[in-house]
Design a protein with these regions (language model features):
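Phosphate-binding P-loop
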Residues: 1-4
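Hydrophobic anchor at the beta1->P-loop junction of P-loop NTPases
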Residues: 9
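The conserved Walker
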Residues: 13
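Conserved lysine of the Walker
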Residues: 17
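Short beta-strand-centered segment that lines the nucleotide-binding/catalytic pocket of NTP-utilizing
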Residues: 30-45
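Switch II (G3) loop of P-loop NTPases
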Residues: 54-61
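Short phosphate-coordinating micro-motif centered on Lys-Gly-acidic
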Residues: 66-67, 72-147
């Protein structure tokens, strides 16, 4: 990931959205243990070499509820932005973002479906194919946009 990337996470409660964001924070060199669900404050920023913005879209429930967010700041090219429950604020998302749909495969396994919305997101999906190392993990490409 690099500054300006936006990830939209979708999945039921307990599907691993916050845990995934903790892993992303660790990969960005941030303190992953500091990452918590932003449920009661809606947005958290984790400063670092590449700052991470973590938004909870669940409580925002649609575009009218997010007009108070400074969208230019949130989706700044100087930050990585990750939105839990991104489907709740789809109308506010930028044109280019990577949607990650999380679901339970088993008690300790998750299935992540990636849908690219834009050129940069397609680059991210293509790059992930080369870094998936788990023998249980697979990356499937469909229609040049979904994985």
């Amino acid at each position: 990931l690099k500054p300006g990337d936006v990830l939209g996470l979708v999945g039921e409660l307990g599907s691993g959205k916050t845990t995934l964001i903790q892993g992303l924070a660790d990969g960005l060199g941030l303190d992953a243990s500091a990452v918590r669900s932003p449920t009661f404050i809606v947005l958290r920023e984790y400063p670092g070499r590449v700052p991470l913005i973590h938004i909870d879209g669940y409580r925002l429930e649609g575009a009218p509820s997010v007009v108070w967010l400074d969208v230019d700041w949130v989706f700044s090219s100087k930050k990585v932005t990750v939105i839990e429950w991104a489907n709740q604020i789809e109308d506010c998302l930028p044109d280019d973002y990577l949607e990650l749909q999380l679901s339970h495969k088993s008690v300790n396994q998750r299935l992540i479906r990636m849908i690219a919305h834009g050129a940069r997101s397609r680059e991210l999906v293509a790059g992930i194919g080369g870094v998936v190392h788990s023998p249980q993990s697979t990356v499937h490409k469909r229609a040049g946009q979904e994985s």
